[in-house]
Amino acid sequence: MYNLSRIIYRFSSVSLNPSTRASGFLLENASSKILQSATNRAFSAKSGSDGVGGDDNGWNISTGGSFGGTGSADLDWDNKSMWSTGLTKEHFDGVSVGRQKNAANPSSDNTPSDSGDVMSKLGPKEVALVNEMNEYDDLLKEIEQDNRQGRAFVDGIKQRMMEISVLLKQVKEPGARGSYLKDSEKTEMYRLHKENPEVYTIERLAKDYRIMRQRVHAILFLKEDEEEEERKLGRPLDDSVDRLLDEYPEFFISHDREFHVASLNYKPDFKVMPEGWDGTIKDMDEVHYEISKKEDDMLYEEFVRRFEFNKMKWRGEVMCHKYSRRRSSEGWKITVEKLGAKGKRGAGGGWKFMSLPDGSSRPLNEMEKVYVKRETPLRRRSIISTEVMRYSPANQKRRSKRKQKRKERRIACLKAGKQT
């Protein structure tokens, strides 16, 4: 409002005719379109030859006669009038004063634009007024931009609060970072991996979509199977359920422990350090993370190995029915392991080969190598989550037995106390 009042004051000071003052003009024309057009124009303080209206431009044609016989030379009809509307020739030639809008490819080799010519003809007061109007336009644009940014910030508060709640949930419960993926996101994941598997690897997709690597393997396999089924049928599959879950994800609230968290026995572990020992110890959270990461890698390798074997069963390469173990007409094929140095087996020395019924031998093929690898025991303790251990049937039975024994001991103690 302060800038607007300054512009009105400058308009009223520029025009010499009271009927053409800017205040009356703005009151009579209150629309925003006229106000904008008025701010893009400059008014001349005089209509004389001050650099705007020259003697040969046709605006200062003298007229004959005298004025009222007063004897004053200034009021003769031959002299130019001092009364002016504040309008110059440029206002009627259609040349805008100030900035050019929709300028079409200005070139530095061409002559200066019409706006530059008009600005060069204006006096210092008019140039200052035009610059002030341009500053006012810039101020309005900045205010509109700030309003748009503020509106976008206010509209995105709900989404940011939901993201913060998810992050707080992750901090409160480590490992619970799984979220429901839409079918469109799974399709996009499969498309990226199919087009460029070297760039969009399993690890990168798991990191981008914030899910487990095992889950990425399963999604890619299912999407590949869907594509194969569509190719066989010649039409797309029914995805009504997937589209329903995509449109209404609140119906399906997923809560998966996407990252393995190791269960540690939090008990003191005192060690006697040598004299003069000046070292540091690791933080408990750091140790917990390292153990969890190591166990997660072990579980991932085991999952991939079992998943590849299950895919072979899916394709029919592994026969597990009751007729697959019958003796063929040629005879049995026997797997023989040759012991190494000092009777060592496995990686320590021995190697396996296949003995055929005719007495010959051959090395193991790929499928037989998979069988041999699956027979190798895992040299590690079983990784079981705390919740599974707590509520497993075996633990429940042991707990009930211990509870019954404690009850029997209490009853025996009470009986012994009464007898004494």
Curated annotation (Swiss-Prot):
Compartment(s) where it occurs, according to its Swiss-Prot or TrEMBL record: Mitochondrion
Annotated spans, Disordered: 99-120, 390-420
Tissue-wise expression: Expressed at high levels in reproductive organs and, at lower levels, ubiquitously.
Compositionally skewed regions (Basic residues) per UniProt: 396-409
Disruption phenotype: Irregular structure and reduced number of cristae in female gametic mitochondria. Completely disrupted male gametophyte functioning (shortened pollen tubes leading to altered style penetration) and impaired female gametes final maturation of the egg and central cells (persistent antipodal cells in embryo sacs, as well as small and short egg cells), not required for double fertilization, but essential for embryogenesis initiation and endosperm development, thus leading to the presence of aborted seeds in siliques.
Keywords associated with the record: Developmental protein, Mitochondrion, Ribonucleoprotein, Ribosomal protein, Transit peptide
Gene Ontology, cellular component aspect: mitochondrion; ribonucleoprotein complex; ribosome
InterPro entries per the UniProt record, alphabetical: GCD1_mitochondrial (IPR052851)
Record carries keyword Transit peptide: yes
Ranges of biased composition (kind: Polar residues): 102-114
Function: Essential for fertility (male and female gametophyte functions and development). Required for the integrity of female gametic mitochondria. Modulates male gametophyte functions, including pollen tube growth and style penetration. Involved in mitochondrial-driven cell-to-cell communication in embryo sacs during female gametes maturation (including embryogenesis initiation and endosperm development), especially for reciprocal signaling between central and egg cells which regulates reciprocal development.
PANTHER family per the UniProt record, alphabetical: MUCIN-LIKE PROTEIN (PTHR35476), SMALL RIBOSOMAL SUBUNIT PROTEIN MS75 (PTHR35476:SF3)
Complexes and interactors: Component of the mitochondrial ribosome small subunit.
Protein name: Small ribosomal subunit protein mS75
Organism of origin: Arabidopsis thaliana
Lineage: Eukaryota, Viridiplantae, Streptophyta, Embryophyta, Tracheophyta
